[in-house]
């Protein structure tokens, strides 16, 4: 009887532990959608920032002939100076591979922009991200400034912290002082990282809205819940370039 009871206990334990293990490492249904977004950051040499942007603007059509540019910004506050940040959309990984191969064979792109401008770049970084399931990419109503808020979450993915994070984001959206452009979850890069891209009319309107949100009980309650899953956070103020699709 004791042996039978021990065996039954082990069997029941294995059945209860299995779902916990799955949920700890699940990353959510976003993976079933092949579309992803590549975040690219170029850290430029201080004296070469304007030259780089002017050169890209002249040759942007050569690059966008191969894949869709979502937005292109310069970092104003909150990050390394003389940095450009841009987002590219791909249908799937095979699509990106095809694009990179085509760019390598595109003599105009190579000779008119890439090769002459490599010397202007000090460092490059890339992340692959998916939109979270409850968010679609939105275009702001007019020109403004952007905030990229980055949250390093505890391991576990959206299955663990997704609902609480969603409530915190929507609490800010519902106040109406800012517009949500997109919420992205990393697939390659620093894992368990979420990027929230916001649009504001100006840096001052954002500041006023944030002060208001800090006094709103709905925002306070939602944020208190979501911070239980938070490791760290940072943000950057981004200024769209003249050739950025997102203004």
From Swiss-Prot:
Gene Ontology biological process terms from the UniProt entry: mitophagy
Residue(s) carrying N6-acetyllysine: 48, 166
Tissue: Ubiquitous. Highly expressed in liver, kidney and muscle. Expressed at intermediate level in brain, heart, colon, thymus, kidney, small intestine, placenta, lung, leukocytes and spleen.
One Pfam family in the UniProt entry: NIPSNAP
Record Gene3D superfamilies: 3.30.70.100
Location (main, coarse): cytoplasm
Entry keyword Cytoplasm: yes
Classification via InterPro entries: Dimeric_a/b-barrel, NIPSNAP, NipSnap_domain
This protein's record includes keyword Lipoprotein: no
Keyword annotations of the record: Acetylation, Cytoplasm
Subcellular location: Cytoplasm, Cytosol
Domain of life: Eukaryota
UniProt GO cellular component terms: cytosol; mitochondrion; nucleus
Assembly, per entry: Interacts with the Salmonella typhimurium virulence protein spiC.
PANTHER family linked to this entry: NIPSNAP-RELATED, PROTEIN NIPSNAP HOMOLOG 3A
Family note: Belongs to the NipSnap family.
Protein name: Protein NipSnap homolog 3A
């Amino acid at each position: 009887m004791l042996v039978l009871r021990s065996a039954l206990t082990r069997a029941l334990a294995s059945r209860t532990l299995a779902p916990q293990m799955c949920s700890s490492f699940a990353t959510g249904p976003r993976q079933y959608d092949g579309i992803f977004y590549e975040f690219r950051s170029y850290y430029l040499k201080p004296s070469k920032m304007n030259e780089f942007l002017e050169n890209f603007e002249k040759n942007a059509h050569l690059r966008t002939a191969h894949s869709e540019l979502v937005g292109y910004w310069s970092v104003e506050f909150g990050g390394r100076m003389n940095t450009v940040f841009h987002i590219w959309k791909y249908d799937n990984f095979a699509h990106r591979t095809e694009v990179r191969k085509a760019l390598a064979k595109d003599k105009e792109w190579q000779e008119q922009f890439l090769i002459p401008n490599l010397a202007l770049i000090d460092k490059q970084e890339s992340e692959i991200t998916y939109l979270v399931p409850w968010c679609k990419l939105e275009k702001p109503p007019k020109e403004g400034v952007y905030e990229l808020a980055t949250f390093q979450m505890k391991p576990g993915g959206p299955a663990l912290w997704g609902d609480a994070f969603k409530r915190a984001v929507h609490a800010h959206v519902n106040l109406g002082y800012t517009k949500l452009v997109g919420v992205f979850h990393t697939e390659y890069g620093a894992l368990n990282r979420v990027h929230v891209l916001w649009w504001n009319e100006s840096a001052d309107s954002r500041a006023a809205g944030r002060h208001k949100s800090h006094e709103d009980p709905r925002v306070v309650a939602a944020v208190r819940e979501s911070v239980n899953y938070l490791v760290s956070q940072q943000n950057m103020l981004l200024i769209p370039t003249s050739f950025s699709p997102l203004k």
